[in-house]
Regions:
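Positively charged, low-complexity terminal tracts
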Residues: 1-72
């Protein structure tokens, strides 16, 4: 069984109905938290992770550099 703990929500990018796309710091299976971009769904009052991507610090820094270059 995969476990998760959202340690901090950095931003909510969008939401529709019972789902929201968020950037969070998430610990998976008791490991150190990593940056996580994912859709979170609320089902029967419980928030569950949907499809997404987890990034190491190095990957997040590379993404930040690429976005900064793209947006100027």
């Amino acid at each position: 069984m995969i476990t998760h703990e959202v340690e901090r929500t950095l931003a909510e990018l969008s939401s529709t109905g019972s789902s929201a796309k968020r950037i969070c710091l998430v610990s998976w299976n008791g490991n150190p938290a990593k940056l996580d971009l994912r859709v979170w769904r609320t089902v029967d009052g419980e928030t569950k992770p949907g499809k997404g991507v987890t990034l190491t610090d190095e990957e997040a820094e590379t993404l930040l550099a690429a976005l900064t270059d793209y947006f100027g």
